Amino acid sequence: CLYGLLLKSANEVANGLAEHVSGRVEAFASLMNQRARELGCTGTNFVNPNGLNNSNHYTTARDMAFIAKAAFDNEIVRQVASTLTYQIPATKNAAARTVTMGHKMINPADSRYYEGVIGGKTGYTSLAGNTLVTCAEKNGKRLIAVIMKSSSSHYADTKALLDYGFALGQNESGARWQQ
């Protein structure tokens, strides 16, 4: 399920997981909001698990960075979010199929590849535009870049943020994770 969710943004998987865990999408969104608050998020309200447009569903880049940090602290999430392709096994209702990672900075064969990226998630809605969350690590320093409402420069903007972050000295205040 996580491969479909993180590699292909399979909204039906997000809804299915929510219903499996909480019985209802709304109940799961409540759990998401509770966890977001625990992580220090102050500008986030979830109403669904897939991020599709809803006027009451919103977040900030800062909050998304807090959420991404918690996610990338999980080894399973890092493994799934860094997978280039995954074959979903056949079921009684569907043949086996392959899903491919949408985040271009992970793929060494792509011109947007960025050395050190250990995972990430793409997104797009008409309200949010292109969104990109990227986790990268170099020389023991882990950074998270969050881009929202981009028309087309989300990869270039992410590269610029990561380049800037990695260029900061170890003792500079911007080089450490701060809440």
Language model features by range: what are they?
Residues L7-H20, V47:
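Substrate-binding clefts and substrate-entry loops adjacent to catalytic sites
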